């Protein structure tokens, strides 16, 4: 039974080892494409196993497979697959055709899937470190670029600090509760004598460690430099799948064992949410690099997502999951458009480089405008519905704290709309200083168009995603 529950993770890890052996044995630059295709195949097989696999608790209560884990894992696999597709042309063009890229992405994905199914703090930490160590290397994958090496080093140093905070919090929880198992913690906290100030401090440290992984303010200091310095496909990857995994881990960690003490951690999450929304909205206004703009944008988006977590209700969890689905596709679509910004063999990253794109590159301008409107929360784009369900959950909770969160969220969305619409203004109303961009690679076109279709037409078919999110929320609160 244990092996059946973890079959997606086991199969994906074994596939990673096989692909690694293939890459090492052949060790030819042209085999990078083969390894990437094998990785995508492994992701597909893992996705099928995840959907059709058994549900339950295994490995002596340390691993859980439930509808919540299934939905989040499929979202993680989607984000990882898109990142591998985006890397195909980019790595070849920048002399980074090495088989290690898809392999590292694969092992990072294994760690994320373990995190999502963790029902014990030790399992959680093992998955977190497997994910993080692979991403540290990916951030510095462009070895010949100084800023990429700087991004990897900065992410590693600050990530180690965050892991230390998380471990310290776990040790406090274990010291005061005597267990690291989520179900045992929930039973212990059901009694009035089960809570203590030391346990609360431990939970706060755990929240701080996980907030770093989702780049929520004030634990966001690594985000702008790492986003800008990392290769763009890596930025697209770390901006989606790892954040989905980390915020899902926050959900399972806080809702499953600590739902009985919601009041004690709700204010901490609400504070992080407010700071993230405000800082993300204000700091992005003056950015000239579109990758740094996306970094601050992601900080704000995580603030909006945390509104659903602060609600702590089924509606809040459902809203958060819907938000994550919309976030992944509009984010990866935006980075696909950034990868299409290339002239004379040089990758461009400035907002000003988009000047006049509405006339010189109408397809790129249209797709990027769709993603900008969605991130701003303008209907009928998918980003509007993501924010709508999160804010509705906060309002329906009926608490003054959550009402305040919803109001701040709406206000910061209005502020944030300025820098998203500024990109649209530059594309359609500024004069073009240079000619059109180079022809799009097929891989970039597929991701950009597919993400745009999902983002623009989400309102026509929301039912399957709403139903899956509702089922996942019920499973988490069960």
Swiss-Prot record:
Pfam families, per database record = Proton_antipo_M
Biological role stated in the UniProt entry: NDH-1 shuttles electrons from NADH, via FMN and iron-sulfur (Fe-S) centers, to quinones in the respiratory chain. The immediate electron acceptor for the enzyme in this species is believed to be ubiquinone. Couples the redox reaction to proton translocation (for every two electrons transferred, four hydrogen ions are translocated across the cytoplasmic membrane), and thus conserves the redox energy in a proton gradient.
* Record membrane topology: Multi-pass membrane protein
- Give the residue spans that cross the bilayer: 5-25, 37-57, 68-88, 99-119, 121-141, 156-176, 199-219, 231-251, 268-288, 293-313, 320-340, 365-385, 401-421, 446-466
Subcellular location per UniProt equals: Cell inner membrane
User: Where does it primarily localize?
Assistant: membrane
Write down the chemical reaction(s) this protein catalyses.
a quinone + NADH + 5 H(+)(in) = a quinol + NAD(+) + 4 H(+)(out)
Taxon lineage: Bacteria, Pseudomonadati, Pseudomonadota, Alphaproteobacteria, Acetobacterales
Keywords for this entry?
Cell inner membrane, Cell membrane, Membrane, NAD, Quinone, Translocase, Transmembrane, Transmembrane helix, Transport, Ubiquinone
Write out the GO cellular component annotations: plasma membrane
According to its UniProt entry, the protein's GO biological process terms are: ATP synthesis coupled electron transport
Q: Which family does it belong to?
A: Belongs to the complex I subunit 2 family.
Cited HAMAP family: NDH1_NuoN_1
**Quaternary structure (record):** NDH-1 is composed of 14 different subunits. Subunits NuoA, H, J, K, L, M, N constitute the membrane sector of the complex.
- Top-level taxon: Bacteria
Q: What is this protein called?
A: NADH-quinone oxidoreductase subunit N
Q: Which InterPro entries match?
A: NADH-Q_OxRdtase_suN/2, ND/Mrp_TM
Q: What class of enzyme is it?
A: translocase
According to the UniProt entry, its GO molecular function terms are: NADH dehydrogenase (ubiquinone) activity; NADH:ubiquinone reductase (non-electrogenic) activity; quinone binding
| EC code | 7.1.1.-
């Amino acid at each position: 039974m244990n092996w059946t529950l973890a079959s997606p993770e086991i199969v994906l890890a074994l596939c990673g080892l096989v692909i690694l052996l293939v890459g090492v044995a052949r060790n030819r630059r042209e085999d990078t494409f083969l390894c990437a295709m094998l990785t995508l195949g492994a992701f597909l097989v893992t996705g099928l196993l995840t959907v059709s696999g058994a549900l339950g608790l295994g490995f002596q209560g340390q691993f859980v497979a439930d509808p919540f884990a299934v939905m989040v894992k499929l979202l993680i696999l989607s984000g990882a697959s898109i990142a591998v597709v985006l890397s195909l042309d980019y790595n070849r063009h920048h002399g980074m055709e090495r088989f290690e890229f898809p392999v590292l992405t694969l092992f990072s994905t294994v760690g994320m899937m373990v995190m999502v199914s963790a029902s014990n703090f030790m399992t959680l930490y093992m998955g977190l470190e497997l994910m993080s160590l692979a991403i540290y290397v990916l951030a510095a994958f462009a070895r010949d670029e100084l800023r990429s090496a700087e991004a990897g080093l900065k992410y590693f140093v600050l990530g180690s600090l965050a892991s230390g905070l998380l471990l310290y919090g776990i040790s406090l929880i274990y010291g005061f509760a005597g267990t690291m198992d989520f179900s045992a913690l929930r039973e212990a906290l059901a009694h009035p004598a089960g809570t203590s100030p030391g346990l609360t401090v431990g939970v706060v440290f755990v929240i701080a460690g996980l907030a770093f992984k989702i780049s929520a303010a004030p634990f966001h200091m690594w985000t702008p430099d790492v986003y800008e310095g990392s290769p763009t496909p890596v930025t697209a990857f770390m901006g989606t799948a790892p954040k989905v995994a980390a915020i899902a881990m926050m959900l399972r960690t806080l809702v499953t064992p600590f739902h009985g003490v919601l009041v004690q951690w709700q204010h901490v999450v609400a504070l992080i949410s407010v700071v993230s929304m405000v800082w993300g909205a204000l700091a992005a206004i003056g950015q000239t690099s579109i990758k740094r703009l996306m970094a601050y944008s992601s900080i704000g988006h995580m603030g909006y997502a945390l509104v659903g977590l602060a609600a702590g209700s089924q509606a809040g969890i459902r809203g958060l999951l819907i938000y994550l689905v919309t976030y992944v596709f509009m984010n990866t679509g935006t980075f696909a458009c950034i990868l299409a910004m290339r002239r004379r063999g040089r990758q461009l990253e400035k907002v000003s480089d988009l000047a006049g794109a509405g006339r010189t590159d109408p397809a790129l301008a249209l797709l990027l405008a769709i993603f900008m409107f969605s991130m701003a929360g303008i209907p009928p784009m998918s980003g509007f519905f993501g924010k709508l369900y999160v804010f509705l959950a906060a309002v329906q909770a009926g608490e003054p704290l959550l009402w305040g969160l919803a109001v701040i969220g709406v206000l910061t969305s209005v502020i944030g709309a300025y820098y998203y619409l500024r990109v649209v203004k530059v594309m359609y109303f500024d004069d073009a200083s240079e000619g059109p961009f180079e022809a799009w690679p097929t891989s970039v076109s597929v991701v950009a168009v597919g993400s745009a279709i999902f983002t623009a037409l989400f309102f026509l078919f929301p039912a399957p995603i709403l139903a899956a999110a509702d089922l996942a929320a019920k499973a988490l609160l069960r």
